[in-house]
Regions:
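Amphipathic, well-packed alpha-helical segments that form the structural scaffold of globular domains
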Residues: 21-22, 97-101, 105, 129-133
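Amphipathic alpha-helical blocks
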Residues: 40-65
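Conserved, non-catalytic sequence blocks in retroelement Pol enzymes and Pol-derived host proteins
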Residues: 61, 84-87, 115-119, 147-149
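Alpha-helical transmembrane segments and immediately membrane-proximal extracytoplasmic
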Residues: 71-72
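Conserved pre-motif C helix in the palm subdomain of viral-like polymerases
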Residues: 79-108
Length: 154
C-alpha cells in the first residue's frame, strides 16, 4: 500500500494543485453541471483546498455528474457527444494526469502521437515523412472509433 500512498501524496501536493489549476485556467472551457466557471475557481480553491484534499485522502470525494453537450460534426445531422466535468473535477483530473504522465510517458511508443503531451498531428506528419525518407513504403492508418463508441459512458 506504500506506493499508492506515495502516489496520492504526489498528486495532492500543493505545487501539483497549483499547476493543475493553471492548466485548467489556460484551457478555459465552460463550467460543468454545477455552473461554476473557470474564473470562479481560484477563490473556491483558496477557501476549500484543505477540505478537498482531506476528502480525497479519506476516499470521500465524489466527482459530480458531467454536463452532456452535443457538438455538431462536419457531417450534417451528426453530433459528437461530450461530457463536461465541473471545473473542480477538471483540476483533480489534471492533478492525477500530471503525476501519472510522469510515470508512464517514457513507456509509450515513440510512434504514438494521440493525446500525448507536447505531441500532435504535425509531429505525426513529420515522423511519417521521416519514415518515407528512410525507405518505408507502407502505412497502416487505424482508428478505434467504433470501439470507443461501445465504451460505457457514465
Amino acid at each position: 500500500m506504500g506506493k499508492i500512498c506515495d502516489l496520492l501524496d504526489l498528486i495532492l501536493q500543493k505545487d501539483n494543485l497549483n499547476e493543475a489549476y493553471k492548466q485548467v485556467k489556460r484551457n478555459k472551457g465552460k463550467g460543468g453541471i454545477d455552473g461554476m466557471q473557470v474564473d470562479e475557481l481560484l477563490p473556491f480553491l483558496k477557501e476549500n483546498q484543505e477540505s478537498l484534499i482531506q476528502e480525497i485522502r479519506e476516499g470521500k470525494y465524489k466527482p459530480n455528474p458531467v454536463r452532456r453537450v452535443e457538438i455538431p460534426k462536419e457531417t450534417k445531422g451528426e453530433f459528437r457527444k461530450l461530457g463536461v466535468p465541473t471545473v473542480v473535477d477538471r483540476v483533480i483530473q489534471q492533478e492525477i494526469s500530471q503525476e501519472i504522465s510522469l510515470i508512464y510517458e517514457e513507456q509509450f511508443s515513440e510512434n504514438s502521437f494521440g493525446f500525448r503531451p507536447r505531441r500532435g498531428a504535425h509531429d505525426a506528419l513529420r515522423q511519417c515523412q521521416k519514415n518515407v525518407n528512410d525507405g518505408y513504403v507502407y502505412v497502416i492508418d487505424s482508428i478505434y472509433e467504433k470501439g470507443l463508441k461501445k465504451m460505457a459512458r457514465s
